[in-house]
Amino acid sequence: MEKSATRQKALLIALPLLFSPLASAVQQAVLDTRGAPLITVNGLTFKDLNRDGKLNPYEDWRLPAAERAADLVSRMTLAEKAGVMMHGSAPTAGSVTGAGTQYDLNAAKTMIADRYVNSFITRLSGDNPAQMAEENNKLQQLAEATRLGIPLTISTDPRSSFQSLVGVSVSVGKFSKWPETLGLAAIGDEELVRRFADIVRQEYRAVGITEALSPQADLATEPRWPRIDGTFGEDPDLTKKMVRGYVTGMQNGKNGLNAQSVISIVKHWVGYGAAKDGWDSHNVYGKYAQFRQNNLQWHIDPFTGAFEAHAAGIMPTYSILRNASWHGKPIEQVGAGFNRFLLTDLLRGQYGFDGVILSDWLITNDCKGDCLTGVKPGEKPVPRGMPWGVEKLTPAERFVKAVNAGVDQFGGVTDSALLVQAVQDGKLTEARLDTSVNRILKQKFQTGLFERPYVNATQANDIVGRADWQQLADDTQARSLVLLQNNNLLPLRKGSRVWLHGIAANAAQEVGFIVVNTPEQADVALIRTHTPYEQPHKNFFFGSRHHEGSLAFRNDNPDYQAIVRASAKVPTLVTVYMERPAILTNVVDKTRAVVANFGVSDSVLLNRLMSGAAYTAKLPFELPSSMSAVRNQQPDLPYDSAKPLFPFGYGLPH
């Protein structure tokens, strides 16, 4: 009843005015409300969000976003301003990360009504888009009931590909399923990336998401780094082009935000990919990005694609840039979220960025005890804090340092009491908070949230994962395959007898193969595997989830054993999911064909292997020849390992 009443109210407002004399001068905005009263001024209708019976400038949809934001800030208390600078994790019952299918509305109400938080990341499942949309509507209803009626910005990590990892990405559910961004980079088509992001934008808006914590503009210069599969590879020029296309599609154009945009938060400024020894800076043991030379410019260049597309947000890296300097001047040894040079002097000053700087999650929290050492055997690790370089400061001092560095909003935090206290104690000025709050609220106005915070949940299932979009996603999966080796094996013939490892038998049968039980019975063996990895840090929350360490196939690797077994009996094709650059030296000497993939379904893969069409995708990073070469390359430089087995840009046509 409530949903249909909301829609009915919006229609009653909009339709009569289309035929009024006022329509020729000012067209009535469509307004959605589930609680805020409406007022009429000069024949036009507005929301009375603060319920004072008057039309205030921030409620006037005719005014520019900047003017509305300034008026709203002038009406806010210090606590309300501090709340805007928090970006929480939308709570679900029984999950510390916010995973699940329904929000904990009581916990959410505390955050929204009592702590004044109005930005949240959602980690809800996408298996039921209509339910997800209505859950987000419920959060917006809580926000509409607050004193000023400020709507929520709901964000998400990527949820459109094969990867799913807490703190990185979300399971795809019913959303269209594409290759990882590495696959888009392998294709190298900026317009395709724009189209991909435009589709994702429409899916996000359909379920009430208006902010994407993506893309990664990080350069994959350290082959062991666990976050490579979220990047566009290791080439600055290619990554710049891909990032520009992504932001353009996500924000619905190159000219800044509009009412159909999804805010793009480009990350992680800057140098994150130069991870020392490949360890990730979500973890204390990986808090350094290693710069052996002054190579920071390599890592900055991809972000210029974001600036050209007027990206609305930037997220700083957790990492400390060890040994990095800028024009001979050393860079302060603190994480980028605390680094005034990186955020204010370089990002805002030199590169002119004027959007929102959103910190990565939990940078003001402590990292003590098992956060430093890992939990004891049998204990379950939980996420703590990432205050790298400022561990000795108090949480209150970290807030002050981050704000003074240039941070506008704090990821993963909902308690703003320390920020309020810092202003009351004279450590920060309220005017400085006003600057950040203005930036954040302006984007809410630009994206149309004050007029239309709700979505039509009944339409979400028809929009999310649309058949024509998934067909394009499947075509993109196929295009992204990189042919590394083919000794007269491809294309495969329909009706061939195949022995499978890592591929579903029904998928092979559906495309016309005959599945057999042993390699000896087969005409060809088809093996799916992934880049090898180790997990030496299972006693750390993120370390227990990251794929770290060696990139080489060891003799005890079950997939490698399948390769050895099959290739001794029958021509063998191996496809490797390249979440990191795999070392294939002891694979290519056994196989007849090798295909790199970056996320592909069995059916798309098998159909492509039977096609005689030329392969056009190219490697977005080099594939090293050995772990010795990996250890000896410089983590801050692209494509610099000795004698790579396959260089950057490699790919056979046939």
Swiss-Prot record:
Catalytic reactions of this protein: Hydrolysis of terminal, non-reducing beta-D-glucosyl residues with release of beta-D-glucose; Hydrolysis of (1->4)-beta-D-xylans, to remove successive D-xylose residues from the non-reducing termini
Alphabetical list of PANTHER family matching this protein: LYSOSOMAL BETA GLUCOSIDASE, PERIPLASMIC BETA-GLUCOSIDASE-RELATED
One Gene Ontology molecular-function label: xylan 1,4-beta-xylosidase activity
Domain of life: Bacteria
Keywords from the UniProt entry: Carbohydrate metabolism, Glycosidase, Hydrolase, Multifunctional enzyme, Periplasm, Polysaccharide degradation, Signal, Xylan degradation
Compartments where located: Periplasm
Top EC group: hydrolase
Name assigned to this protein: Periplasmic beta-glucosidase/beta-xylosidase
Family of this protein: Belongs to the glycosyl hydrolase 3 family.
SUPFAM superfamilies the UniProt entry points to: (Trans)glycosidases (SSF51445), Beta-D-glucan exohydrolase, C-terminal domain (SSF52279)
Pfam families: Glyco_hydro_3
Gene Ontology CC annotation, any one: periplasmic space
GO biological process: glucan catabolic process; xylan catabolic process
EC number: 3.2.1.21, 3.2.1.37
Protein role: Exhibits both beta-glucosidase and beta-xylosidase activities.
